[in-house]
A protein has these predicted regions:
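Well-ordered alpha-helical scaffold segments within catalytic/enzyme domains
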Residues: 333-341
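Short, surface-exposed loop/turn segments at secondary-structure junctions
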Residues: 317-318, 342-346
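Conserved small/polar residues in nucleotide/adenosyl-binding loops
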Residues: 347-354
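Catalytic alpha/beta active-site cores
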Residues: 1-317, 329, 353
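Conserved phosphate/anionic-ligand binding catalytic regions in large, soluble enzymes, centered on
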Residues: 320-333
């Protein structure tokens, strides 16, 4: 299939299986980062589209590392050091692990090759949920991700360059929209990062909630968004869902054939849309009957679902669980070809109407 939101929280919490080996829940942040990149590589090798992971699921493992270091130093030094000194020791170790873990994510994604012969097309979703019990840990993780992206990765000549992946999406909300919120410093860092490295892209949590029934979630890979869907308990679910496939329609090509004849353009468009529908249904029907054993990491071990061995995936193809997409390109070019005027010219009525109709 095309793209997905990996259910990384479930896979880290409840374990997964890769190459016939059980991967249990990590006991530290560094291990969680390593396991996450292994999951990304395995998932990317069995689908042709991109995938996204929500960084907030790593927060609990950073706290596990903090608690582990605190217990270690308390046992080692007992009452011979003050709480301030103890916390300084713990934070020094924690920051080292935080940097190493984030570096693992960045370098693994940019050096691992999937069976498709390319780096995984993966997006990291950087969102701070005010109700998240690990929000402080996640703020630390996001800050480190941005700092390392600003620095870049050295190429073969030792020059720092902008890595192609992972793509970053940063969520703007009330607490970080540069209006005096607690996490405004992260947004300023994100803007600095975008100015130098082109990423992150930005999503408005306010607009997401307006458009998606109060939910905030990542696109799948680069641009395709899921529609809201509720499970049998009435709970919204986004992670662990996917897009079956996409077909894009070339609008300028139709405009070239129409040669300015609007009636001919709309007739051709209807014909092409019918063809697109047939292509999308061909993709859908090709997936029907697929058994979970075709890609265990997706269907059996948590990336999408936890189906039984050789269980058909059909129930995940219907009733809104997954999506199928029709895309388009060239609205600007089409309007220019049909009217002879740039569509950004609001004073030209026909250009404006053509663009609006499209």
């Amino acid at each position: 299939f095309n793209c997905c939101l990996i259910n990384i929280g479930d896979m880290l919490e409840n374990g997964t299986v890769m190459n016939g080996k059980l991967i249990e829940t990590p006991k530290s942040f560094q291990v969680a980062c390593t396991v996450m990149t292994q999951i990304i590589s395995a998932v990317a090798s069995s689908q042709y589209g991109g995938q996204s992971v929500d960084i907030r699921h790593l927060g609990k493992y950073l706290r596990k590392s903090h608690d582990k270091y605190e217990a270690h130093y308390r046992q080692k030094y007992g009452d011979t050091i003050t709480e301030d000194v103890l916390e300084e020791f713990v934070n020094d170790r924690l920051m080292d692990e935080l940097k190493s873990g984030v570096q693992t994510i960045q370098y693994q994604i940019n050096t691992l090759m999937t069976t498709n012969g390319q780096s995984p097309f993966v997006t990291l979703f950087l969102n701070l949920d005010k109700d998240d019990p690990y929000i402080e840990e996640n703020a630390m993780i996001i800050e480190e991700i941005l700092n390392q992206r600003i620095e870049g990765i050295k190429n073969e000549k030792g020059v720092y360059v902008t890595p192609a992946f992972p793509k970053l999406i940063y969520v703007l909300d009330e607490h970080n929209c540069l209006k005096g919120g607690k996490y405004d410093y992260l947004t300023r860092l994100a803007v600095k990062c975008s100015a130098k490295r082109m990423y992150p892209d930005y999503i408005s949590a306010k607009k997401m909630r307006e458009n998606y029934e109060g939910n905030v979630f990542s696109c799948m890979g680069c641009r395709s968004f899921l529609t809201p869907w509720k499970d049998e308990n009435g709970e919204y679910k986004f992670e662990g869902r996917f897009n079956q496939g996409v077909v894009s329609i070339n609008l300028p090509q139709i405009a070239i054939i129409a040669q300015g004849d609007e009636e001919k353009f709309w007739t051709l468009l209807e014909e092409r849309l019918a063809l697109c529908f047939d292509a999308l249904m061909a993709r859908h029907h090709a997936l029907e009957g697929t058994l979970s054993s075709v890609s265990p990491i997706h269907w059996q071990y948590g990336a999408i679902a936890r189906l039984g061995k050789d269980e058909p995936i059909d129930k995940l193809l219907h009733d809104g669980y997954s999506t199928i997409s029709l895309g388009y390109i060239g609205v600007y070019e089409t309007t220019k070809l049909m009217t002879g005027v740039s569509p950004v010219s609001y004073t030209h009525l026909r250009a404006h109407e053509t663009r609006s109709n499209l």
